Amino acid sequence: MSHVSNSTDEVVRNYLAAKSMVTSLKAFDQESSFAKEANYQVDRCIDEMTDAIDKHDVDTLCAMWESWNARVFHSLDTEGIKQAQCYEASAYRLFLVRCVQKKNISKCNEFFRKMSSLTLNNPQWADWFAFPYNHHAKDTEPFRKYFDKTWIEIYYVSLHNFLSTSLANVSPSVIGTIVEGIARDPTGNDHVDFDEDLIDDFAVIAQCSAPVKRGHSKPSLRNLLKSLTSSKKPSPSTD
């Protein structure tokens, strides 16, 4: 899928250049470079999660998982979604353990209030309501492993790998899908409806990149992108 990403980046760059958006183009190049080098910033995501746990920041922690579920994990298969739910539950339990270790019981109560939709009437969470008041939780199932440093380290490594893999499988953007289709079948007639303003904007790019034959009807975005990609291809040798 890397060629699709590169083609999409090129379309965006051409668009910004056509609009003379020099500052935006520079910012886009910087952000694209940073995203690639940081491997979608997985390391930073994990750091932010551990920081939220250490600071007893339930709002940030829950918001992060809500974002991951909506933007990344939603595209997984059934088994993958179940795995994501297990990682999420473990993150919340590590949060509770950290709060108990720091004797911040009020944050535990805050968590249960805000996450009642997840924890109430859920057999997997039944034992955890009494956890903040269990003085021997460290040596009691099912809490014991969440105090184990080795298990915690393995959890974070596993979560990092899972998040990296999930990000790699995220469905490409609409434009990326079209570009991939053009590369796979240059003569295809797939039809997709787009907003007219979007088509007009990309018509500007096409005019700057390659000649486009005009008819009485508005050109399709697919054909405009096709003109862009075809203009990049080397001409066949006549030797």
Swiss-Prot record:
It comes from the Eukaryota. One of its GO terms (biological process) is negative regulation of phosphatidylinositol 3-kinase/protein kinase B signal transduction. The keyword Hydrolase does not apply. GO terms for molecular function: phosphatidylinositol 3-kinase inhibitor activity. Keywords: Cytoplasm, Endosome. Disruption phenotype: Coelomocytes contain larger early and late endosomes enriched with PtdIns3P. Delayed conversion of early endosomes to late endosomes with early endosomes retaining PtdInsP3 for a longer duration of time which may possibly be due to a delay in either the turnover or transport of PtdIns3P out of the endosome. This leads to continuous fusion of early endosomes which continues until rab-5 is displaced and rab-7 is recruited. Double knockout with sorf-2 results in a similar phenotype as the individual single sorf-1 knockout. Its main location: other. It is found in: Early endosome; Late endosome; Cytoplasm. GO terms for cellular component: cytosol; early endosome; early endosome lumen; early endosome membrane; endosome membrane; late endosome; late endosome lumen; late endosome membrane. Belongs to the WD repeat WDR91 family. Together with sorf-2 negatively regulates the levels of phosphatidylinositol 3-phosphate (PtdIns3P) to enable the conversion of early endosomes to late endosomes. Binds to sorf-2 and the sorf-1-sorf-2 complex likely acts through bec-1, a non-catalytic subunit of phosphatidylinositol 3-kinase (PI3K), to suppress PI3K activity, thereby negatively regulating endosomal PtdIns3P levels. Interacts with sorf-2; the interaction is direct. Interacts with bec-1. This is Suppressor of organelle fusion 1. It comes from Caenorhabditis elegans. The gene is sorf-1.
